[in-house]
Amino acid sequence: MHLTLAHVGARPGSKDEVDALTQVYLERCSPFARCRSEAFRTEDALMEWLQKQQGRMPAVAVLLDSRGRTMTSEIFAAWLGMRRDEGAQHIVFAIGPASGWSQTARDRAQLLLSLGPMTLAHALARLVVAEQLYRAFTILTGHPYHAGH
């Protein structure tokens, strides 16, 4: 399974400490899935990239959206496990532009996912998603990382 953590509105090459920690969590996921991070300048660029993925490795599009579904870590792990067991080859978790997702993008998504009612900076949202992906895999494999939640 391939996982991509995508975000819109990025300046090419801009990195900070939060990005470094996000990368740590994505690397921790490597025993379970191939993970990478992708930055896109615009929503249109991301949507075009997603469309191109359909020919190679069909992607499940999960858009992070304040109006989306909230999940506990356990429910998120179960959702991810179901996608894996159904044979999903590629899941893209995308953090949108500051103005929010267009209706076209929302309609294209298989899941709108909310991290909660608070607004997060894009870098922090990426970190939270990366950590929750790692946590989900540890829940699915019975690893003690989540045991003391």
Residue ranges and their predicted role:
Residues R11, S66-R69, P97-W101:
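Short glycine-rich anion-binding loops that position phosphate/pyrophosphate groups of nucleotides
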Residues V18-T22, I75-W79, D107-Q110, L127-V128:
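Short, glycine/charged-enriched secondary-structure capping and boundary segments
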Residues L5, V62, G96, V129:
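Conserved RecA-like P-loop NTPase ATPase core
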